[in-house]
Amino acid sequence: MPHAHVSLITLGVSDLRRTARFYETLGFVRKVKAAGEDVAFFEAGGVALSLFDDKRLAEDATLRPEPALPDFRGITLAWNCESEDGVDEVLATAGKAGGRILKPAQKAFWGGYHGYFADPEGHVWEVAHNPHFPLSPDGRPTLPD
C-alpha cells in the first residue's frame, strides 16, 4: 500500500483567471504555465494546489455539476501561521485581493487565534495560529502524539 498523504488539492472554479490572480496575490507560486489556461497549478507548502474549471472537474469525476453551489460545501482549507500577526496579515491580504472575510481574526475556543475567508469562488479557508501545533521550518504543522 502506498504511503497515505495528500499530494494535490483541486478546487473547481468558474473563473480561472480571476481566481488564479487571487492566489498569486496571496503569495502562492504558480507553476506549469505550459499547461495552458484550462488549469492552474501552485506550490502550496508541500502539496500542490490546482484550479480547474468546475464543470469540467465534475465531468471528469463523473458527477453532475451543481447549478448553484451552496455557501458551505462541507470542507475548509487551512493556512497555519507562526503568529497571530501572520493571521492578521493573511486575512488582510485576502480581503484586499477580492476575498470575502467570513470571520475576522479572533481568539479561538481551542486556545489559538483564527479567522476565515472565502476566495472569489467561495472556497473557505481558515487562517490560524495554533500554539498546540508548532510549525516546522518548512511551514508544516507538527501534530502531537
Regions found by a protein language model. Give the residues of each.
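Minor-groove-contacting beta-hairpin "wing" of winged helix-turn-helix DNA-binding domains
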Residues: 39-43
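Short, small/polar residue-rich loop motifs at catalytic or cofactor-binding pockets
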Residues: 110-112
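Glyoxalase I/VOC metalloenzyme domain signal
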Residues: 1-7, 12-34, 44-100, 118-145
